[in-house]
């Protein structure tokens, strides 16, 4: 028996139309250093139409890739809608990649046009001669640029087009946007999101983050990474004011923007949110308008969640996902009826799977194991916004029986709460036992003198691998390896306790704020660290 329901396309065009028609007075607000620029959804929608017309005039047709190399601002939002709604593919370029990788992904995606901020033009100029597919460069901003040949001014090209555009029919399974993984363990790999996946993911973000038209959403998450976690699309769809910090991502700039525009919700990686917390504690900045923040990208220390609650009065939610999952897959809400004193048990977990996504854990043989909170294995995921392959790259080892292999190791309990204990490549295998680098890092950051920490496995003649702990101390604080190991001792098994310690000014991070453990291992192998070695503990 067939249903009687209508079959409407699930496309970004429909999200765009809805936000434009229902919430014309909601605003895009871009911080410009001292003051913010306010533009209504209705006015932005006209500019979206003009941009689509300009790209069509330049010869862009459905399926063509149009890249952006931009900060978070109104013009980037315009590209977020104009490019996919006209049938082309939005390719957001990671502005923190080294030039060699930037050129590699532009060439791999075969971008025909690049929209670039004037402040980022030197980065593009450093690779443009290597990018044969790029035919036109459109520059946002009025700053002088050089090294890019003949360029087009963003405002000039959109001013030449009418404020209306006839959007073509869209196949909901066609590519809408693409993002490349950060490539910490190999070359970056492209993930192409469909209109259908973005549409469905937007509803998941709306429900999971509880967005609506009474709220103001501060998008700190870079728009070059995984569609800024889908927040621009979800926020536009439900009429949330969208607050964009531009290039002003240092704590002082963020605080100034927050104090001026009073957002109610935000999100970011632990590095950014920790820096914001420290700034407020030392300068007294006012972030009281924010009621909720979501944190992801790497494990969120329980101490950070508690500090946001106790110091800032902000409820901090931990979320988990990856480029391949669009990215939202889990969110760490306590179950209904949890006593306040027990909430941290759940808030500090990786989270419970969001509706629409399935998770399982498998052993080394690929066999699913019980969700009992004890059995450990690799986490696999599937769902309508989870990738089934990579763009023009064969990677069969990443896919298993219709599931995406995440490379994360952990367990799932009977209530569906996930606890990631490590990346499969980062698990420390010592004398036949597994040691979780993530758990050691989280515990170390709980020490009052520690600002940041990383743990990696290094060669050991007796045990094959042992943990090396890298520690960043807070300004003015002091701690010794013995003190830190004593702090860990009651919290973990004895064989987990590191013998090798080094203190550093900062930890290497990837372009999206994750620990770069590949670089840490390389630097250790080249003896770049001054390592203190303690006497081994007895097993």
Where are these regions (language model features)?
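Conserved AMP-binding/adenylation subdomain of ANL enzymes
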Residues: 199-216, 224-264, 279
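Conserved beta-loop-beta connector loops within the AMP-binding
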Residues: 356-380, 414-415, 477-481, 516
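Conserved AMP-binding/adenylate-forming core of the ANL superfamily
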Residues: 28-73, 77-81, 98-103, 153-156
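Conserved pre-ATP/AMP-binding loop-to-beta segment of ANL
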Residues: 9, 24-26, 150, 159-180, ...
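AMP-binding/adenylate-forming catalytic domain of the ANL superfamily
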Residues: 140, 493-514, 533-539
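AMP-binding/adenylate-forming catalytic core of the ANL superfamily
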Residues: 97, 114-118, 266, 383, ...
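Gly/Ser/Thr-rich phosphate-binding loop
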Residues: 237, 263-268, 277-345, 358, ...
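Structural core segment of the AMP-binding/adenylate-forming
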Residues: 15-17, 57-58, 85-156, 475-477
């Amino acid at each position: 028996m067939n249903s009687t329901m209508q079959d409407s396309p699930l496309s970004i065009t429909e999200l765009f139309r809805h936000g434009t028609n229902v919430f014309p007075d909601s605003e895009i607000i871009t911080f410009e250093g001292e003051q913010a620029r306010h533009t209504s959804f209705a006015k932005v929608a006209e500019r979206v139409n003009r941009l689509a017309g300009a790209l069509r005039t330049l010869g862009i047709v459905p399926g063509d890739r149009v890249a952006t190399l931009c900060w978070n601002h109104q013009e980037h939002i315009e590209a977020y809608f104009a490019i996919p709604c006209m049938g082309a593919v939005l390719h957001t370029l990671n502005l923190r990649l080294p030039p060699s990788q930037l050129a590699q992904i532009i060439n791999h995606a075969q971008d025909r046009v690049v929209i670039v901020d004037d402040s980022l033009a030197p980065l593009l100029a450093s690779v443009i001669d290597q990018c044969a597919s790029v035919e036109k460069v459109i520059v946002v901003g009025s700053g002088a640029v050089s090294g890019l040949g003949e360029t087009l001014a963003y405002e000039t090209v959109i001013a030449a087009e009418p404020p209306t555009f006839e959007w073509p029919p869209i196949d909901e399974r066609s590519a809408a946007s693409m993002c490349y993984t950060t490539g910490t363990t190999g070359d970056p790999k492209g993930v192409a999101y469909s209109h259908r996946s973005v549409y469905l993911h937007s509803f998941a973000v709306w429900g999971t983050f509880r967005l609506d038209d009474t709220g103001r959403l501060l998008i700190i998450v870079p728009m070059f990474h995984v569609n800024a976690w889908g927040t621009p699309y979800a926020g536009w769809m439900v009429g949330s004011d969208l607050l964009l910090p531009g290039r002003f991502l240092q704590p002082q700039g963020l605080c100034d923007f927050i104090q001026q525009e009073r957002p109610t919700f935000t999100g970011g990686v632990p590095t950014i949110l920790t820096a914001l917390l420290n700034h407020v504690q030392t300068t007294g900045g006012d972030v009281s308008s924010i009621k909720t923040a979501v944190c992801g990208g790497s494990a969120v220390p329980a101490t950070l969640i508690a500090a946001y609650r106790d110091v800032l009065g902000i409820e901090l939610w931990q979320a988990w996902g990856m480029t391949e999952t669009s990215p939202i897959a889990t969110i760490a809400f306590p179950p209904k009826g949890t006593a306040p004193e027990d909430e941290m048990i759940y808030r500090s977990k990786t989270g419970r799977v969001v509706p629409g996504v399935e998770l399982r854990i498998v052993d080394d043989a690929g066999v699913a194991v019980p969700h009992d909170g004890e059995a450990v294995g690799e986490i696999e995921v599937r769902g309508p916004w989870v990738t089934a392959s990579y763009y023009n790259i064969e990677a069969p080892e990443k896919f298993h029986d219709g599931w995406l292999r995440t490379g994360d190791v952990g367990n799932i309990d009977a209530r569906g709460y996930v606890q990631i204990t490590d990346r499969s490549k980062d698990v420390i295998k010592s004398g036949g036992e597994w040691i979780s680098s993530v758990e050691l890092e989280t515990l170390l950051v709980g020490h009052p003198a520690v600002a940041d920490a990383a743990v990696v496995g290094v060669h050991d003649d007796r045990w094959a691998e042992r943990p090396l702990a890298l520690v960043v101390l807070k300004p003015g604080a002091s701690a010794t390896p013995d003190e830190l190991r004593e702090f860990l001792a009651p919290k973990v098994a004895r064989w987990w306790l590191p013998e090798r310690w080094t203190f550093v000014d900062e930890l290497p991070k990837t372009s999206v704020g994750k620990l770069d453990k590949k670089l840490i291992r390389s630097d250790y192998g080249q003896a770049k660290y001054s390592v203190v070695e303690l006497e081994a503990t007895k097993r």
